[in-house]
């Protein structure tokens, strides 16, 4: 049974992501052409080496974040990391991942719901997502109620020019 817990010193340490499987085989991505996003062929593999996993572990356990873990026993199989500091009306999802072997099990939906709960508690109007442009990633965020924003946060959009800038407004 996968459980969702707030990251703490009791359930997370620097090597907690050592066996995490970021791997994603991407076939199609969204690209802006003529003012519209269209799907184009662009095959590549997204993955993390040991150094990247350690860097991510350090980042998501920072004091400036609220991070929830999806745990299978004591093994991290997913996480959502939100920036505590609101940016205007938005709480920013800095990272959200589900390990390759656990995708399609509803873990991402559960993590995203926790993100919405935290945003609501913080007084945000919406979650802000700089989404990887892969077909599957964008489909997930759309299924969760997110849409492209007309008002991207410039520094985030500039930092990730191929990402789609999305928001998910919180229901009353």
Residues covered by each model-derived region:
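Short, Lys/Arg-enriched, disordered terminal segments
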Residues: 1-3, 171-172
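Acetyl-CoA-dependent GNAT
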Residues: 8-13, 19-90, 94, 99, ...
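Conserved acetyl-CoA-binding loop-helix of GNAT-fold acetyltransferases
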Residues: 98, 104-117, 142-143
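Conserved GNAT acetyl-CoA-binding A-motif
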Residues: 119-131
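Structural motif
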Residues: 122, 143-144
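Conserved catalytic-core motifs of GNAT/GCN5-like acyltransferases
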Residues: 128, 132, 147-164
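Helix-turn-helix
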Residues: 137
């Amino acid at each position: 049974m996968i459980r969702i817990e707030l990251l703490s010193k009791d359930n997370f340490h620097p090597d907690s992501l050592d066996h995490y499987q970021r791997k994603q085989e991407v076939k199609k991505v969204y690209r802006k052409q003529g003012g519209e996003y269209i799907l184009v062929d662009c095959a590549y593999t997204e993955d993390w080496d040991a150094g990247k996993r350690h860097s991510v572990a350090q980042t998501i356990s920072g004091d400036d974040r609220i991070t929830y873990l999806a745990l299978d026993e004591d093994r991290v199989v997913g996480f959502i990391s939100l920036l505590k500091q609101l940016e205007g009306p938005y709480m920013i999802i800095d990272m959200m991942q589900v390990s390759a072997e656990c995708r399609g099990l509803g873990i991402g939906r559960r993590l995203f719901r926790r993100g919405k709960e935290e945003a609501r508690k913080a007084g945000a109007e919406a979650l802000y997502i700089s989404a990887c442009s892969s077909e599957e990633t964008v489909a997930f965020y759309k299924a969760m109620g997110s849409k492209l924003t007309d008002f991207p946060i410039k520094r985030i959009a500039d930092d990730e020019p191929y990402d789609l800038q999305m928001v998910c407004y919180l229901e009353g």
